[in-house]
């Protein structure tokens, strides 16, 4: 299934954050049988697709951005260990750096944060070859799709702390947690409560259209 060819394509930058500086992104929702509609916010499109048994979301370039189906378990091997001294740095800095490290990229994340750049802006600038997705408003269950695709999910947990969701199973999620100085498991229901209380603020990323 793909969007109708007569519908306008996405314009502006391909940040995937629901709106671009020079235009508006459109996200197309399908069930297994039919086209269900178009949304301008990715989180709204995912919410609509998640209500379907086999819902999917695609963009104007026919890329699948989300599917309801995902593996029962997943783990991102590149992020299952943590270097010493991580707890001495801000969790925001360390999580951003860990994402870049996993893609063999380097940047002065500390300096960019000091300049007032947001996490979204830093990833858009430095994570070459990927489109960054603002998944704020999605549920934890919904964003686990990206972990299943082996892309970490950057998640706020409150009090200016963040973690990376790097794995999951039927009962737990695996967290790269700089504030704790460790990679550890958290009960899925507990994680839902923590992240919901923090506003369900998530980021992830998918290969840019030209990279696929």
Per-region residue spans from a language model:
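N-terminal, intrinsically disordered, polar/charged segments of Gram-positive cell-envelope systems
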Residues: 1-23, 74
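Surface-exposed flexible segments
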Residues: 37-44, 66-72, 164-170
């Amino acid at each position: 299934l793909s969007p109708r060819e007569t519908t306008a394509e996405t314009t502006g930058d391909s940040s995937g954050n629901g709106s671009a500086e020079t235009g508006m992104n459109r996200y197309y929702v399908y069930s297994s049988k039919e086209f269900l509609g178009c949304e301008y916010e990715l989180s709204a499109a995912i919410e609509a697709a998640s209500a379907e048994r086999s819902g999917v979301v695609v963009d104007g370039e026919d890329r699948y951005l989300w599917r309801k189906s995902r593996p029962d378990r997943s783990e991102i091997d590149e992020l299952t260990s943590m270097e010493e001294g991580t707890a001495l740095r801000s969790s925001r800095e360390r999580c951003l750096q860990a994402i870049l490290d996993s893609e063999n990229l380097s940047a002065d994340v500390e300096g960019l944060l000091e300049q007032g750049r947001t996490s979204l802006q830093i990833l858009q600038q430095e994570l070459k070859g990927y489109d960054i997705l603002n998944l704020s408003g999605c549920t934890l269950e919904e964003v686990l799709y990206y972990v299943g695709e082996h892309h970490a999910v950057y998640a706020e947990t409150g009090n200016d702390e963040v973690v990376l969701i790097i794995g999951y199973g039927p009962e737990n999620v695996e967290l790269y947690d700089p504030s704790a100085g460790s990679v550890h498991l958290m009960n899925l229901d507990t994680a839902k409560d923590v992240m919901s209380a923090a506003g369900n603020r998530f980021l992830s990323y998918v290969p840019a259209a030209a990279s696929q």
